[in-house]
């Protein structure tokens, strides 16, 4: 695998109506070859000057969830700290909040999640000495990247239904609408909001063995001749 994904979590109830939890996520690519020092001062290629570095995103999340007094309703809140590291070249710290609401009735589950509701900010610290080692590309001098990265709020609406069959078989069907408040190349896109539908299935046997499949990432891809082509994954 090119990328590594690691996850750990802990949760426990506070009382019969609420619970809290913490989680740690790492998503990174390790052992990337750094060839910025490949050529020595005399213009000779020296492979011993190649080093390796990792780029990784870390997410620490504190979560709280509670059932509401209205039957079937429950909500949750995430407070998250984000750490991003690109070798010795740059690193950043960020923070943000997510909120979610769920409703269950007659075996149907409905959900609304607002991600990065306050806008998530990542403030970068860039190693200018390492950046200056990068060569010019096509005679163009590279500008130092901006030090603040902004993640705008997103919304996600979902619905699911569990179907149980004879002999311990079950099927969970779910559909999501993932919304970004900007224009993208999603199949449904306006100047105000872009919507990416997703459909998923989960087959289970005795709630022990699970098999998942799904469709998503519906987009209008721009081809080499500037025409658009519909695609999905």
Question: Which sequence ranges carry the predicted segments?
Answer:
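Subset of outer-membrane beta-barrel
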Residues: 1-233
């Amino acid at each position: 695998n090119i990328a590594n994904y690691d996850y750990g979590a802990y949760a426990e109830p506070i009382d019969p109506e609420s619970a809290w939890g913490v989680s740690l996520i790492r998503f990174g690519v390790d052992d990337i070859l750094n060839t910025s020092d490949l050529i020595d001062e005399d213009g000779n290629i020296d492979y011993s000057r190649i080093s390796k570095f990792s780029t990784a995103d870390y997410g620490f999340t504190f979560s709280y969830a509670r059932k509401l007094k209205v039957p079937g309703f429950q909500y949750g809140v995430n407070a998250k700290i984000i750490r991003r590291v690109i070798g010795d070249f740059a690193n950043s710290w960020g923070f943000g909040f997510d909120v979610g609401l769920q409703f269950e009735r007659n075996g149907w589950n409905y959900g609304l999640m607002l991600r990065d509701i306050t806008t998530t900010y990542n403030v970068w610290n860039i190693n200018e000495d390492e950046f200056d080692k990068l060569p010019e590309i096509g005679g163009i001098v590279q500008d130092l990247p901006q030090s603040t990265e902004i993640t705008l709020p997103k919304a996600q609406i979902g619905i699911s239904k569990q179907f149980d069959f004879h002999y311990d078989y079950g099927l969970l069907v779910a559909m999501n609408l993932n919304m970004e408040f900007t224009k993208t190349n999603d199949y449904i896109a306006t100047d105000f909001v872009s919507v990416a539908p997703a459909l998923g299935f989960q087959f289970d046997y005795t709630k022990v063995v699970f098999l998942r499949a799904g469709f998503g990432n519906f987009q209008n891809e721009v081809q080499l001749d500037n025409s658009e082509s519909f695609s999905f994954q």
